[in-house]
């Protein structure tokens, strides 16, 4: 079964956390729980940050974040309430002195990390939240989180597009050891929202099984709350990089019912970056992939074979291979990969049911 992948990841996690300690960030010890929970979808609960008097006005009107901003100050910003900690990897303890410009030290396996993009992301979140928008949604109920505390470290960050527009769910990688949202899903979601789409970045529990359960729950949550969120889940897409690409592919192939939820429609398209996934089920959805030739983790030749096999089964699939790029290049801004997201969005649009 695909989730034997977790066994190897347990070993990798131990090694990685040791390495991060040397770099100045040590492991937090968030535990994975692979038992399924099939109880109901969490209802939308509007999170508000109480503001009163001059102190609150000062907090809301504080200066924009910069590359010199300390990560702990961003996490603790009152405008983010108690979900600020989920903006950065919760599986690493972050040194109090670490600034945004040093963010690469808590993003192992990634390349082309741009602190200025991280600044844009956190300021976008701050401005939206201080303007009264709800930017974070729990996918599990309080009862579910009480029964399984690991579910406290899950949820969806909402990057709003146009009201009633199509929806995308973006899943960051991190080797199923941590969630690299600040580099591998938030930037993608922000760019998709600029195109008018409603984009959600999932924070999930590391571990292949729990990650897929959380993605299945996220899909269920969005379907159940589409009217309140003012989104269109018809022809939604699943995006992901590295481990997140595996999640997107597995949900696309197996569906939500395989991971403890009722059966919901499968995505119109799966968008994958730099993953070594090679297993073909025959149930793949239309798939776009991109990878660099310099990737020492996800072989571009393996990805080419994967996409070719999907096409051989009669399903639309496309791959872009970028010369010289390493693993985890994200948006690839300023590289030969810049613009891949535009191509991926076009692929998604081409495979929407309304366009068939």
Placement of each model-derived feature along the sequence:
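N-terminal targeting or regulatory segments adjacent to alpha/beta-hydrolase or S9 domains
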Residues: 2-4, 10-16, 22, 27-153
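Conserved alpha/beta-hydrolase "acid-adjacent" motif
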Residues: 296-302
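Short beta-strand/loop motif that positions the catalytic acidic residue
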Residues: 289-291, 295
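Primarily recognizes the serine-hydrolase "nucleophile elbow" in alpha/beta-hydrolase
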Residues: 213, 217-284
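Short beta-strand element of the alpha/beta-hydrolase
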Residues: 165-174
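Short amphipathic alpha-helix adjacent to the substrate-entry channel of hydrolases
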Residues: 181-200
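C-terminal catalytic histidine-bearing segment of alpha/beta-hydrolase fold enzymes
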Residues: 53, 59-84, 313-356
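Catalytic nucleophile-loop/oxyanion-hole region of alpha/beta-hydrolase
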Residues: 180-182, 200-229, 334-337
């Amino acid at each position: 079964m695909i989730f034997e992948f977790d066994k190897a990841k347990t070993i990798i996690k131990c090694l990685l956390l040791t390495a991060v300690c040397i770099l100045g960030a040590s492991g937090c010890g968030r535990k994975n729980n692979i038992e399924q929970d099939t109880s109901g979808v969490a209802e939308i609960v509007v999170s508000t940050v109480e503001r009163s008097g001059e102190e609150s006005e000062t907090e809301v009107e504080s200066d924009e974040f910069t590359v010199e901003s300390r990560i702990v100050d961003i996490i603790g910003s009152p405008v983010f309430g108690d979900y600020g900690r989920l903006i950065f990897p919760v599986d690493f303890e972050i040194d109090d002195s670490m600034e945004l410009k040093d963010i690469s030290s808590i993003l192992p396996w990634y390349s082309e990390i741009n602190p200025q993009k991280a600044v844009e992301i956190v300021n976008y979140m701050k401005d939206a939240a201080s303007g009264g928008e709800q930017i974070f949604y729990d996918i599990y109920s309080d009862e579910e989180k009480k029964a399984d505390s690991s579910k406290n470290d899950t949820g969806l960050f909402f990057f709003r597009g146009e009201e009633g527009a199509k929806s995308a769910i973006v899943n960051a990688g991190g080797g199923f050891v941590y969630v690299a949202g600040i580099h591998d899903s938030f930037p993608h979601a922000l760019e998709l929202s600029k195109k008018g789409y409603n984009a959600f970045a999932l924070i999930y529990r590391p571990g292949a099984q729990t990650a897929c359960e959380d993605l299945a729950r996220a899909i269920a949550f969005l379907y159940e709350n589409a009217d309140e969120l003012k989104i269109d889940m018809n022809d939604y897409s699943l995006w992901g990089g590295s481990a997140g690409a595996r999640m997107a592919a597995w949900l696309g192939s197996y569906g939500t019912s395989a991971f403890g939820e009722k059966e919901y429609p499968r995505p119109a398209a799966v968008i994958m970056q730099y993953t070594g996934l090679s297993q073909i089920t025959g149930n793949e959805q239309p798939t776009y992939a991109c990878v660099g030739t310099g990737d020492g983790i996800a072989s571009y030749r393996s990805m080419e074979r994967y996409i070719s096999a999907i096409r051989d089964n009669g399903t639309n699939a496309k791959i872009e291979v970028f010369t010289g790029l390493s693993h985890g290049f994200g948006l690839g801004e300023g590289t030969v990969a810049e613009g891949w997201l535009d191509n991926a969005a076009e692929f998604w649009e081409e495979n929407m049911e309304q366009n068939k």
